[in-house]
Design a protein with these regions (language model features):
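Extracytoplasmic low-complexity, Pro/Thr/Ser/Ala/Gly-rich segments
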Residues: 1-47
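Short glycine-rich, low-complexity/disordered patches
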Residues: 15-33, 92-114
Length: 151
């Protein structure tokens, strides 16, 4: 699912089930997507949803309210075509060898600290080495946080 088409398919399935693409958190793994989808008419309440290929979108058991560092965003505002290049750059720059996990975290603007909405590409391995690239909603990298541990 970590492809532009995979993400678009999942977001479309979530929108078909929930009636919206407004979320406060979206985490995209190769096998599934977890989303905190905003409740209709609210800027603070959300419900958890999951998308898996072959199963579609399913509502989870978690309901909650946004934290002071979260705000709603529209999934359609992100340039999903930028995702492959983010992960290509992450592999080159994050100093994570023997990668066992990769995922993308998408979040709205942070009203507390003033960070804009964006997406972060994470890599990690079985030795607890990890790093991430943070980018704006168009895919422009704004921060590189490589693994700094010795191999």
């Amino acid at each position: 699912l970590l492809t532009p088409d995979g993400i678009r398919t999942a977001v479309a399935a979530l929108r078909a089930e929930t009636g919206t693409d407004r979320m406060c958190r979206l985490v995209i793994y190769p096998e599934h997507i977890s989303a905190d989808v905003m409740v209709d008419g609210s800027n603070t309440r959300y419900e958890s949803w999951t998308y898996r290929p072959g199963e579609g979108a399913t509502k989870g058991i978690i309901e909650g309210t946004t934290s002071p560092t979260q705000s709603p965003f529209r999934a359609g505002a992100f340039d999903w075509d930028a995702v492959p290049a983010l992960f290509e750059r992450a592999v080159k720059e994050l100093n994570v060898m023997d990668i066992t996990s990769r995922y993308l975290v998408v979040s709205g603007a942070d009203p507390t600290f003033g960070d804009p909405m964006g997406m972060s590409a994470y890599l990690s391995n079985g030795y607890r080495h990890s790093g991430y690239l943070a980018a704006d909603h168009r895919g422009k990298v704004t921060r590189v946080m490589p693994n700094d541990e010795e191999y």
